[in-house]
Structure formats: structure tokens, C-alpha cells
A protein has these predicted regions:
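Conserved beta-strand hairpin/beta-sheet module of binuclear metal-dependent hydrolase folds
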Residues: 2-50, 180, 184-199
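Pre-active-site segment of Zn-dependent metallo-hydrolases
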Residues: 16-17, 31-59, 75, 102, ...
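Binuclear metal-dependent phosphoesterase catalytic core
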Residues: 265-266, 274-299
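Metallo-beta-lactamase
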Residues: 93-185, 277-287
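Cap/insert and terminal regions of metallo-dependent hydrolase folds
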Residues: 65-69, 85, 175-186, 190-279
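Active-site metal-binding motif and surrounding structural segment of the metallo-beta-lactamase
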Residues: 42-93, 217-225, 252-253
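Active-site metal-binding loops of divalent metal-dependent hydrolases
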Residues: 8-10, 37-40, 65, 90-92, ...
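Short, hinge-like loop/turn segments at secondary-structure boundaries
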Residues: 53, 102-107, 242-243, 271-274, ...
């Protein structure tokens, strides 16, 4: 298994473009999965510079509906075959907002206190583009390719990983309520070396999400984690607990990035031996071992 980070807040090599977003290109056997598409078009230009032909993508998956994870797909769609499978989770088209009134340090920098953060497209857009492979999943765990799974329907995290009150969604009656991120999903690749988990933002709590992965794959250790852990706005105690979780886990590669935030990244760099600086241009692959028959727990 090989992954390449196409879009991220930071870049690892000169000539690549950074943006506040995330996009990862995953290669596993014959599968070419694009996990998230960033906010604008950095993933497109970076892919070209990295020698990756996005026309070869065999599937697309969105971690959740915030524009910094799927906005770039608006520019990418024309490259893809019309029947390419595109996976979102149920709730993907619920409108989401960031309420700056719950984030006092930012109030002076925003003229509007409510910022629409997703989704950047409506359901009809996919069909207008002729993308007939789009589908919304409702499964706890669905295999979308050999050894590649999408996991959703995460439990509401406990108070230590509670969703920040600034994250709100539009309820059935039009009122804004706390966002529980019903559409959030992660990608899990079952490799001979262990599980590789790709997250978008881990709004449902990275520790809670990884614990759910362990319950659904009880015989397989988590080897690597890449993606956002949503440790912003920074809470020193939550960051310390998260770093401690990683430090005492089976994880040998912690490519946390994006919404982990500057404070979170600094703590990981200083205290988590498995930490791997991650940004656009990162190429990482698992060692080659013979595969075992162990797999996920059937639910």
C-alpha cells in the first residue's frame, strides 16, 4: 500500500502548493482511491507535479462535507469517468456552519459571525455533471475494494472529545443545532503490517474513532494513522491526552496533520516517537509482507 498527500496546509517540497485542506491519493493493488479533494485545486496541480494522473482514479471518498475536504472536487470532476464510484456517508448534504460567536478570539476578524462551511455542492450537482457513481452510504463498515474499507456511524464522543460548540448544522426545522457529524467516515486499509487509518478531521474525536476501528477489526492492530485530529481550537489537556493515547498505542506511524493545529503538532513532535511530519508531497508505503486471513469483525 502506498499513499501520497496531494493537498495539506503545509508542503514538504518546494514547488508544491499548500492550502487549508486535505487530499490523499491511495494505491492498494489495482485500487486508486482519492480520499478527500482539498478546498480548491491544489490537489490537481500538485498531483501533476508529483506525476500522478488523477484520470486513473478508481474511486473517491469524502470524509465529511466541509469545503476544505471536498471543495476541490468541483474542479476535479471533469477528469473522472462518469461511472467512477464516489462515496459519501448519509447526512453529507446537510448544511454546516461555523459559529464565530462561540470562538471569541476570532470575533474581531470576521464580519459575519456565521460562516457556511459545507457542503460546496448539492445532490443534484453530481447528476448534472453526469457522475452516476455517486452514492451515500449508511453502513457502519463497507468494503469498497480489496482490503479497503470505509467506516462511519461513530458513537457520540464523551466530554473529553466533545465537538466544539462553534460547529453547528441546519436542523430539520431550519434552526442551527450542535453538529454531531453524522456523515463523517474514515478509510481503513488492511495491510499485512496492520491497519492504516485515513481521517479527514476526526470531528467525532480521534481517540473515539480509533477505538471504534479497533472494535470493528478486533484481530488487527492499527499500524499507521494519517490525517486531521481536530485539536483546534487548542485545548492543552485534550492535546496531551491525545498524544498520550498515540504514545501508548500500537501505532508506529502518526502522520497527524491539517486540523491538528500548531500546538498539537508541536506536542506530537516532542512527545510521540511515531510522529511523522506530514504535508503535500509526502509519499509513504507499508512494508511488503505476506497477507494473513485475519480481517474485520462482521456486524
Amino acid at each position: 500500500m502506498k499513499l501520497t498527500v496531494l493537498s495539506e496546509n503545509a508542503v514538504l517540497y518546494p514547488g508544491l502548493e499548500g492550502e487549508f485542506g486535505l487530499s490523499v491519493y491511495l494505491e492498494e493493488g489495482d485500487t486508486r482511491l482519492l480520499f478527500d479533494a482539498g478546498e480548491r485545486d491544489a490537489c490537481l496541480r500538485n498531483a501533476e507535479k508529483l506525476g500522478i494522473d488523477l484520470r486513473r482514479v478508481t474511486a473517491v471518498a469524502f470524509s465529511h462535507n466541509h469545503r476544505d475536504h471536498c471543495g476541490g472536487f468541483l474542479r476535479l470532476a471533469e477528469l473522472l469517468p462518469p461511472d467512477v464510484p464516489i462515496y459519501a456517508h448519509s447526512g453529507f448534504f446537510i448544511r454546516k456552519w461555523w459559529d464565530h460567536r462561540c470562538d471569541p478570539p476570532q470575533q474581531e476578524t470576521y464580519s459575519q459571525m456565521l460562516e457556511l462551511v459545507g457542503p460546496p455542492m448539492e445532490a443534484s450537482w453530481f447528476f448534472q455533471q453526469g457522475l452516476t457513481g455517486f452514492r451515500c452510504l449508511a453502513d457502519d463498515c463497507m468494503q469498497i475494494a480489496p482490503h479497503v474499507y470505509l467506516l462511519g456511524n461513530f458513537p457520540v464522543p464523551g466530554p473529553e472529545e466533545a465537538v466544539h460548540p462553534s460547529s453547528v448544522l441546519e436542523g430539520p426545522d431550519g434552526r442551527l443545532v450542535l453538529d454531531t457529524f453524522p456523515e463523517e467516515q474514515v478509510c481503513v486499509v488492511d495491510t499485512p503490517a496492520g491497519l492504516v487509518v485515513l481521517t479527514g478531521c476526526a470531528h467525532n474525536g480521534i481517540r473515539s474513532i480509533l477505538s471504534t476501528v479497533e472494535r470493528r477489526f478486533p484481530e488487527r492492530p492499527i499500524q499507521a494513522v494519517f490525517g486531521g485530529t481536530h485539536l483546534v481550537p487548542p485545548d492543552p489537556e485534550r492535546i496531551a491526552r491525545t498524544a498520550d493515547y498515540f504514545r501508548h498505542s500500537s501505532i508506529t506511524c502518526a502522520g497527524v496533520c491539517h486540523c491538528t493545529g500548531p500546538m498539537g503538532l508541536e506536542v506530537f513532535a516532542q512527545t510521540v516517537p511515531a510522529y511523522l511530519p506530514t504535508g503535500a508531497g509526502l509519499v509513504w508505503q507499508t512494508p511488503s509482507f505476506a497477507r494473513t486471513s485475519a480481517g474485520r469483525k462482521e456486524s
